[in-house]
Amino acid sequence: MNKHVALGMTGFSLIAVTYGMARFSWGIMLPDIRQAIPFTPEVAGIIAACSYVAYSLSVFLASFLTDRFGPRLPAVLAGISAAIGLVILALAYSPLILATGLFIAGLSSGLASPSLAAAVSKRISAERQTQVNTLINAGTSGGIILSVLVLRVMSGNWRLACIVFAVMALFCLFAVLRTLLRERAEQLRSPPRWRVVLAKSGMFRLLVIAFVSGVASAAWWSFGPELLQRHTGLDSAITHMLWLVSGGAGIAAVFTGSAAKRIGMRGVYCCSLLFMAVSLVSLALSHGFAWWLFPVAALNGAGYVILSGVLLVRGAALAEPSPAAGVSLAFLMLAVGQIVGSVAFGQLYGAIGAAGALVFFSGLSGGLLFISPEGER
């Protein structure tokens, strides 16, 4: 197996575990968790925000560890924190324990992305980096698909599913240890100065986009299944199917690099925002099952994963020769936005209802069409 394939598949697997299972499986498990451990939508938003707070902290740590010790250490820590957090979730009996487990699991995704971006920058030729990065980023969808399938097989037993996810995280460590080799001291460099990275042309604009994108995306990724069941009135079987479609559609992010060659990265970026905006408005207007909910779910899944791929590629490019720092900053602001979005959507949901909250969050995605990560109008 050549290094492009080995690194791509290892990264895909690690992202699947840390994002799809340790982070985004919360959304699909939320309705069942609320039946076992009752709490309000406002509390649900606060618990979901814990994952993003953890992400915000670990993404800085990942950049430091990557530059000081190489990509291997933070990648290994990502798998370990995912496993520990998922086990705590499986054993939880109160909202506080749920928040603790989700926080520890949330550390994993922040550790994973910058380390993998740095590994790609060091080991993959420049002309192949966008394709490998977007392949790795699509692991989010792979993890979501697998998490839905596991939950279906286990008839919604979310505690047992969390244990299965934790075991998968530990298995992923073997691939990480084999593919990401320990680096020699002379290959490492001192951590970048954040002021230097922030001063890079176009970086501030990218961070604004990442923040607002995070706010807008929280509606679906923190409350999607809850909305499908309580707002739209679907049963758990259809909800799981729609979540599976949403995750599966995100696999389209694998083709981000190829699409960018045809319509440009700005075109890819605009499409991703339109996907997210249209899907949220459609969900706001839906009551009861309709066939068009399947493309709605697909649009949201594809839109978010493609958009995060744009942020990853652009952040890494702007921050050269310290791509991990650029990815860390972009994904940090994405996570900060998701913290704000999770809490804000929970409050709006409780105050004005799901429809009004969804329309408002859709407008955030639409507004970003007027700001390009490349500075074009």
Q: Residue locations for each model-derived region?
A:
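Extracytoplasmic gate region of multi-pass secondary transporters
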Residues: 26-27, 203-244, 251
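Conserved MFS/SLC helix-loop-helix module at the cytosolic interface between two early adjacent transmembrane helices
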Residues: 57-95
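Helix-to-loop junctions at the C-terminal end of transmembrane segments
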Residues: 58-70, 252-265, 349
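Cytoplasmic helix-loop-helix junction between adjacent transmembrane helices
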Residues: 101-138
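Helix-loop-helix hairpin linking two adjacent transmembrane segments in secondary transporters
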Residues: 126-180
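Symmetry-related core transmembrane helices of the 12-TM Major Facilitator Superfamily/SLC fold
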Residues: 161-177, 356-373
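C-terminal transmembrane helical hairpin of 12-TM major facilitator-type secondary transporters
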Residues: 266-311
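A late C-terminal transmembrane helix in Major Facilitator Superfamily
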Residues: 318-354, 361
